[in-house]
Amino acid sequence: MTRSLAALCLSLLLGTAWAQQPIRILVGFPVGGTIDTVARLLADQMKDDLGAAVVVDSRPGAGGQIAAQALRQSAPDGRTLLLSPDHTMVMLPLTVKAPGFQPLSDFAPVGQVARYPGGLAVSKAAPVSNLAEFFAWAKANPAQANVGIPAPGSIPQFFVFTLARQAKAPLSSVPYRGSAPLVQDLLGGQIAAGTTALGDFVEHHAGGKLRVIAVLDQRRSPLLPEVPTFLEQGYKVDWEYWLGMFAPAGTPQAAIERVNAALGRALARPDVRERMQRIVFEPAHGTPAALGEKIRQGTAYWEPVVREAGWVLQ
């Protein structure tokens, strides 16, 4: 009874504090990008539920590192949140010498927001339509077997390493500064192939400007039902990209639970689901504990790959 009363009092105090000042959602990626779009959609839907203005605070750069550091330095009062992809929470601590944060000790998971597939696409001029043809072509043309990735040290880079090892193909990663320039070079034929979030390819695939030859997910995408997964084509790569919400460590549990509940209600709205699915994000609400477990599982999955690839901490 005492614990319940204390929780109720804290909840009332939090409600008063939130009504007086806005809640910030930090985003470490460019304005207008898919993660920024999701953040603004959630901010608009959650404000009434939380009884306060919710604003998106854009802190782009360094693969989300700048925004994550800003969260670490924020007060744990429930008014500063971070919308982050798996890259920031899993890969940065594995590939950067001093990321400035440790996900499981500096942050409090609030809940998963979405899952989304990846894809491997080839230029329109590439004479391939599936993985078997792509790897045969790569072996016959090793100097051209370059695969664009959105950033050095990103999940796509180590995904390409894993794929090359399984196929025994001479694939080389070519890092870009984001998915947009990668896709532009793919459309222009400056690079033979590229891998990033599937949503960056869908429109161009539909328009015949490039070809997606494999989907990185456990099942086919309803937007590209004709394109098989890597698993269907015989390759054991089934990583699921995800997006989650975090608060600073030490944030009161009542605040975490309140934001998680508001997040869940927002993600359950048909209009929110439709708008997220339009940019190839599948709403996937979960508990704080489940999100923390995703970080642990992701670290266990990628750490040996990073080590085997001989990655030197930057």
Predicted regions and their residues:
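C-terminal lobe and pocket-closing loops
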Residues: 115, 201-268, 300
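A ligand-binding cleft/hinge motif common to bilobed small-molecule-binding domains
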Residues: 88-97, 162-166, 193-225
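Bacterial N-terminal signal peptides
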Residues: 4-16
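Beta->alpha turn/N-cap motifs
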Residues: 83-88, 149, 179, 196-201, ...
